[in-house]
Regions:
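Beta-strand-rich domains and repeat architectures in extracellular enzymes and scaffolds
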Residues: 31-79, 126-127
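Blade-level signature of beta-propeller repeat domains, shared across WD40, Kelch, NHL, RCC1
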Residues: 366-418
Length: 418
């Protein structure tokens, strides 16, 4: 009898044992939200921006300031603005000629070399945006890298806002607005007639310069007058010792010939609210989102800077991000690269949420909402480039880069401020 009990006990003990493995452990699914739809693959030049016209035409820019391989020199065939003409090919836009400044994008007759000061050629375009009237605008920094990776200073004529197919289509920035070390990064447009005396609308531009003079530039599109606000304010500057991680790797700044540093990009992502009454922005070197009433930025009176600095709202942390975009729901979309994700801020309740998550997402650079109800965005591995620390070599980018799209929630579409 005792033996029978012992055998029974042993059997119960054996049946109570569980397999020792990870199969029953909860794990990160890696994906969330609507699936990504592949739109375009880039096999040649390094892209940042994406813009979608009302008819579905796609445009991108290739800034020579972020990759010396995109700097135009005579005979190399490079361009800084292109139309995506098939799933895998691009063509210079609006022409190869305007993308080919005589002698190249760098003026080697100055010391040190500087950006070519051509007002009628693209030098180093950082952004292309389609406005509410379906017009394309190109934001040119006037800055590019030399073959050894040195970022040259801009000269007058280089930094500009160019409206394609407009009667007066180029707005030059004075050197008191676009400094030689400025980096004009992104732009948004409000074309409502009541926002400026000229009745032609206004543009808001971020200056994300890593050299430090960050701020917001405002442009009257009718008169061409421009001015700055919030210069050096903490809201447009990177956080001290800001460090983010991508796919397990710390993103220290990789400064050639110098010790590793921190991400020093200032105000970059920018978006208007759906009613045009607020402007949102965020530094790449920060997780904090800020906004200001646009009326405070359009004011250029004697006390306007004092009033502007007192009107800023801090909306808290929204993750590591670059570009922004808006939809008719009022949501402000942004990357959340540490989560392989796209998030959105809801001004109506002050919360930030994840909308899409996928292992294919690394650095979400630029967004564009289409009138077709989709959110388009570039994924370009910027964080794997030579500008960031890497323990696996100076450049870990692997072609191709990509444009994806996802449907906007709740029948969202492009906001037309006009």
């Amino acid at each position: 009898m005792a033996r029978i009990l012992a055998v029974a006990a042993f059997g119960l003990l054996c049946s109570a044992q569980r397999p020792f493995s990870t199969s029953e452990l909860i794990r990160d699914p890696g994906v969330y939200g609507p699936p990504l739809e592949l739109v375009h693959l880039y096999y040649d030049s390094f892209p940042t921006g994406i813009a979608v016209s009302a008819s579905g035409r796609l445009f991108s820019n290739y800034p020579g300031a972020l990759d010396q391989n995109d700097t135009y020199a005579p005979g190399n065939g490079r361009y800084t603005i292109a139309e995506l003409v098939s799933n895998t090919t691009e063509s210079p836009y609006p022409s190869a000629a305007i993308n080919s400044p005589p002698g190249g994008a760098i003026n080697y007759t100055t010391y040190p070399p500087s950006g070519a000061g051509y007002s009628n050629y693209f030098i180093g375009s950082q952004s292309i945006v389609i406005d509410a009237l379906d017009r394309a605008w190109v934001l040119d920094t006037g800055r590019v890298q030399t073959p050894n990776g040195t970022l040259v200073y801009a000269t007058y004529g280089g930094p500009k806002l160019v409206g394609i197919n407009l009667t007066n289509n180029t707005i030059l920035f004075p050197t008191t607005v676009a400094f030689p070390d400025s980096y004009l990064n992104d732009v948004r447009f409000d074309l409502r007639k009541n926002v400026t005396a000229s009745g032609k609308g206004v543009a808001y531009i971020t200056d994300s310069s890593v050299e430090g003079r960050n701020g917001i530039i405002i442009v009257d599109l009718g008169t061409g007058e421009s001015w700055r606000h919030l210069d050096g304010h903490p809201s447009v500057r990177p956080e001290q010792q800001y460090l983010s991680f991508q796919w397990g790797v710390p993103l220290y700044a990789n400064n050639a010939g110098k010790p590793f540093g921190y991400n020093s990009f200032g105000a970059d992502g920018i978006s208007l609210s759906a009613d045009g009454e607020s402007l949102f922005w965020k530094a790449v070197g920060s997780r904090y989102l800020f906004s200001i009433p646009t009326a405070r930025l359009r004011d250029n009176s004697a006390t306007s800077e004092v009033m502007a600095q007192g009107a800023i709202t801090n909306h808290g942390q929204t993750g590591q991000s670059d570009g922004f975009e808006l939809d008719s729901n009022g949501y402000i979309y942004h990357g959340n690269m540490e989560q392989n994700a796209i998030g959105f801020f809801n001004p109506a309740n002050g919360t930030d949420q994840i909308y899409v998550r996928d292992p294919l997402i690394n650095w979400v650079d630029t967004f564009s909402t289409g009138t077709d109800g989709y959110l388009y965005f570039t994924v370009n591995q910027l964080d794997f480039g030579p500008g960031f620390y890497s323990n696996a070599g100076p450049d870990r980018r692997v072609k191709p880069w990509a444009v994806f799209r996802v449907p906007l929630p709740y029948n969202g579409t492009k906001v037309l401020l006009c």
